[in-house]
Amino acid sequence: MTDKNPLVLAFVGDAYWTLYVRNFLVRDSSAKAGALHLRANKYVCAKAQAAFFQTLAPVLTDTETQIAHRARNADSHTRPKNCTLAEYKLATAFEAVVGYNYLLGDFKRLENLFDLILKEKQLC
């Protein structure tokens, strides 16, 4: 899986993280869809993902760190709209690590990583 293009890993990781956040918010909420959408956007935007990556960086495996490094340095030909380039690159690294673990089928690892984020950032 480490030979996959890091931007492909980020593409998958972004989708999985978005679904995870939406599921998390819906589980314990009676809010309407519009309100849930606004809350979810706070956690799937590049600024938030960059902060989440910094929370996870110290506990990443060597392989995850290499994937994050490759993703950060990949040229996506897309420029950020609502964040800095540095935040965008960290968000891409976060998404790539998520995508890597998702494609490996390592859902236990994803749960552990997401638990760290939820604990640190109080998602809800």
Residue ranges: model-predicted function:
Residues 1-124:
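Double-stranded RNA-binding/processing signature
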